[in-house]
Regions:
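Short secondary-structure junctions
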Residues: 43-45, 81-82, 157-159
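Perimembrane loop-to-helix junctions flanking transmembrane segments
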Residues: 32-50
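Hydrophobic, membrane-facing alpha-helical anchors
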Residues: 65, 82-94
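Generic hydrophobic alpha-helical membrane-segment signal
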Residues: 55-56, 67, 101, 131
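Active-site recognition of the HExxH zinc-binding catalytic motif
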Residues: 63-76, 113
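Metalloprotease/metallohydrolase-associated module, dominated by Zn2+-dependent proteases
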Residues: 1-36, 89-169
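Catalytic Zn2+-binding segment of zinc metalloproteases
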Residues: 71-83, 153
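Short pre-active-site segment immediately N-terminal to the catalytic Zn-binding motif
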Residues: 46-65
């Protein structure tokens, strides 16, 4: 059985992120307005909307890199070798040594970035921490969907990472 990251999965990730943002729109708006009003580094123009877009772009790049590095560290802890890359606008970490991992280990690898970054942001209790938490959570929707898919599989199964997703063995 295989899990393939397809256009359908990307749309599902976008929809989940959209629903979350729609439900939390007031909180999210307050956090971003606080970010651009209280931190001079993010106040680049006199238009809040443009400042918010710039802040999102500036913060998304290092958050994404850290997210993928955490995946890589988790793979390494379980004996894998990784390569990092980009496919379109998406960054990815891929296990390249062919190691086959128990389902539980693979779920830990999938969820390690959202877990560690979220916990770290509890220590930064200001709007920057909130924005980093939010952007990482939204960027982790694919990992969460894959973990949910795996949790439904046999608990004794093994996973082989593939370029297109993963195989359940």
């Amino acid at each position: 059985m295989s899990f393939k990251v397809s256009c359908k999965i990307h749309i599902l990730c976008f929809l989940l992120a959209y629903i979350f943002c729609y439900i939390q729109i007031d909180n999210i708006s307050n956090v971003f307005v606080d970010l651009v009003t209280n931190y001079k580094i993010f106040r680049l123009t006199d238009i809040y909307f443009i400042d918010i877009i710039i802040a999102i772009l500036v913060l998304t790049i290092p958050i994404t890199l850290l997210h993928e590095i955490i995946h890589g560290i988790a793979y390494s802890l379980f004996g894998g070798k990784v390569k990092f890359g980009f496919k379109g606008i998406y960054a990815y970490t891929q296990e390249i040594s062919g190691v086959i991992l128990h389902r539980t280990k693979f779920v830990l690898i999938l969820l390690s970035p959202v877990t560690f970054i979220s916990l770290a942001m509890l220590l930064i209790q200001n709007s920057i921490g909130s924005v980093i938490f939010l952007l990482n959570l939204l960027g982790s929707t694919g990992d969460i969907i894959m973990a949910m898919y795996l949790v439904k599989s046999n608990s004794n199964s093994y996973i082989k990472d593939r370029e297109y997703g993963f195989d359940i063995i």
